[in-house]
């Protein structure tokens, strides 16, 4: 029978734990696969973008006997398109354009006896934004823009046992840098941007080896760009809302 510490460990790392004996003596390895619905909006000086898409989520976690953990996560869109925030017909006759995105996250952390966890990590998000034909047929322009955002984050969370499962709440602060390759192939680098991430998840055991995890996350980051006096791009604001579900297997 799982004890209180084991359930908190499961929720804190967003995966289900098996017996506390494994957690305390041998360590644990888990793999996960899932899907998430993502709502992403970015606003910058000179334009905006909005996309709603599904992504495939893959990940693996190793938990040491002393409740330190290392997590590797990867997300990739399954099919995505973008338009302006207001969806006006003035842009591309109201038609959507292709959008691709992948996110890589590495996290290390420690789960304490009271269900509190401290964690830190690195995230890299890369996106390709297809441009309307009317914009790239002009001389010197390209068919797509590229956006890369990467940086480090620190966070804290707390897990609570609820029936047969556990709820986890977490908050993180990130320092991120953005790089944009624009419609004429110029690369713009931001100065340090920052922002926050708020998350909540519910984890429930199905068997000794399988569990289900449901999660929701809100992220918001802002950037300033040093464009050497150019007025086309000076700042940017990104906002992401994610709702997902994962199936987790413990080896």
Spans of features found by a protein language model:
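Predominantly the C-terminal beta-signal and adjacent terminal strand-loop region
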Residues: 192-251
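Short glycine/proline- and aromatic-enriched beta-strand/turn motifs that initiate or cap beta-hairpins
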Residues: 22-89
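Outer-membrane beta-barrel strand-turn architecture
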Residues: 17, 62-66, 110-114, 160-164, ...
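Repeated loop/turn-to-beta-strand initiation elements of outer-membrane beta-barrel proteins
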Residues: 31, 66-72, 114-118, 164-169, ...
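Residues that define the transmembrane beta-barrel architecture of outer-membrane proteins
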Residues: 27-29, 50-56, 98-104, 124, ...
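Flexible, solvent-exposed loop segments that connect beta-strands
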Residues: 41-49, 78-99, 126-148, 178-192, ...
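Transmembrane beta-strands of outer-membrane beta-barrel pores
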Residues: 35-41, 74-80, 122-128, 150, ...
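Residues on the lipid-exposed face of transmembrane beta-strands in outer-membrane beta-barrel proteins
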Residues: 35, 58-62, 106-110, 120-122, ...
């Amino acid at each position: 029978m799982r004890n209180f510490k084991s359930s908190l460990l499961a929720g804190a790392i967003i995966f289900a734990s098996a017996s506390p004996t494994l957690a305390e003596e041998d360590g644990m390895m888990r793999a996960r696969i899932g899907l998430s619905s993502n709502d992403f909006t970015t606003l910058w000086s000179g334009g905006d973008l909005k996309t709603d898409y599904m992504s495939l989520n893959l990940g693996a976690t190793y938990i040491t006997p002393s409740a330190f953990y290392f997590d590797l996560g990867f997300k990739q869109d399954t099919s995505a398109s973008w338009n302006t925030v207001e969806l006006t017909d003035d842009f591309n006759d109201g038609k959507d354009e292709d959008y691709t995105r992948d996110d890589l996250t590495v996290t290390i952390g420690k789960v304490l006896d009271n269900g509190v966890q401290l964690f830190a990590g690195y995230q890299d998000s890369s996106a390709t934004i297809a441009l309307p034909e009317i914009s790239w047929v002009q001389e010197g322009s390209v068919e797509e823009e590229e956006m890369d955002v990467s940086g480090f984050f620190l966070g804290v969370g707390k897990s609570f046992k609820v029936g047969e499962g556990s709820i986890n709440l977490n908050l993180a602060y990130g320092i991120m840098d953005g790089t944009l390759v624009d419609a004429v192939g110029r690369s713009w680098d931001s100065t340090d941007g920052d922002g926050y991430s708020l998350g909540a998840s519910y984890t429930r055991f199905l068997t000794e080896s399988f569990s289900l995890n449901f999660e929701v996350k809100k992220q918001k980051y802002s950037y300033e760009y040093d464009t050497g006096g150019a007025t086309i791009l000076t700042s940017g604001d990104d906002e992401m809302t994610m709702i997902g579900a994962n199936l987790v297997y413990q080896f």
